[in-house]
């Protein structure tokens, strides 16, 4: 009986050595990235920028195409710029546009979708930036840090505007000509 117990204990202790892991191919992981040779990097504080647009009365708009009375300034800071890599940089803005006016970004209301208003962006010369297009103007890279200035302004896209909180999601990309 003792021999059986010793043999059984030996088998239990040896089983991890004898056991082989079973491997079954279950899938693959595809990892992709991109190496770029950009002339500038976006400063951390400009990567997820929030611009507070303020509060406006619906009667501040005189009809479709009319702008809010106030332009709200914002800036994007670029760092580690090198004119040895690229001589100019531009900013392209992308996002959803309303069917009523593809020259502005969609301003969505809480749970209502289109609020009857769009968001227009302008460069530092107050030229309107058309959404989802390449920049029309580029800035020379003269220093290692640059700040590009813009303004945002609401524009009526419908006779019917829905009061409430509104927001717009806009993405930007550095473009080198």
Curated annotation (Swiss-Prot):
Major place of localization? Answer: other
One GO cellular component term of this record is: pilus
The positions making up the signal sequence are: 1-19
Q: Where in the cell is it found?
A: Fimbrium
Disulfide-bonded cysteines? 40-81
Q: Which UniProt keywords apply?
A: Disulfide bond, Fimbrium, Signal
Q: InterPro entries, from UniProt?
A: Adhesion_dom_fimbrial, Adhesion_dom_fimbrial_sf, Adhesion_dom_sf, Bact_Fimbrial_Adh_Pro
Q: Name one Pfam family in it.
A: Fimbrial
GO biological process terms on file: cell adhesion involved in single-species biofilm formation
Family under the similarity heading: Belongs to the fimbrial protein family.
Protein name as it appears in the record: Fimbrin-like protein FimI
